[in-house]
Regions:
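N-terminal pre-domain/capping segments
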Residues: 1-73, 78-97
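Active-site acidic/histidine proton-transfer and metal-coordination neighborhood
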Residues: 78-163
Length: 163
């Protein structure tokens, strides 16, 4: 059995995926997770294919499999919240496109908080939003990350995520 071990690494405008691979290799990792921009805002740079291809070569040379790499969605999205719903769906569609451009098939997402809403309504928003995001037949799987359950966070248990 081969262990797959990694951590969060950076992804900056200059070195992009190549820099992420280099950082993971410095840690001795064979996988990693990253944000395609700062997790607290919507600023995203243009993905440069030539850097991505260099990253692929470095990954191949070091036995890092692309299917094990994960993008983490930014914290500013909240599919639960009616007021942030449209923004969140649109921004996550862009993140899915960025994943596809990088060849990455997994996007991790915090479901969000139900601020001022019934929990069932918030969960229905998550389901509706995910269906809208994934309706284009893309190859990216959205992975819901469990939450600590503090305050109005949704997704504190597997039962809640499997709603």
């Amino acid at each position: 059995m081969n262990l797959i071990i990694g951590s969060h690494v950076s992804f900056n405008r200059d070195t992009q995926l190549l820099g992420s691979v280099e950082e993971a290799l410095r840690y001795g990792s064979n996988t990693f997770m990253f944000y395609t921009g700062a997790p607290q805002n919507t600023k995203r740079g243009i993905i440069r294919d030539e850097i991505t291809y260099q990253a692929y070569k470095l990954m191949k040379d070091n036995d890092i499999k692309l299917e094990n790499i994960i993008v983490h969605a930014p914290y500013i999205v909240n599919l639960c919240n009616d007021e942030k719903f449209e923004f969140s769906v649109n921004f996550l569609k862009q993140e899915v496109e960025r994943c596809e451009q990088l060849g990455i098939t997994k996007l991790v997402l915090h479901p969000g908080s139900s601020v001022g809403l019934e929990r069932e309504h918030a969960i229905s928003n998550i389901i509706k939003g995910l269906n809208m995001i994934l309706s284009n037949g893309n190859q990216v799987t959205i992975c819901l990350e469990t939450m600590a359950g503090k305050g109005t966070e949704v997704g504190k248990s597997f039962e809640e995520l499997s709603y």
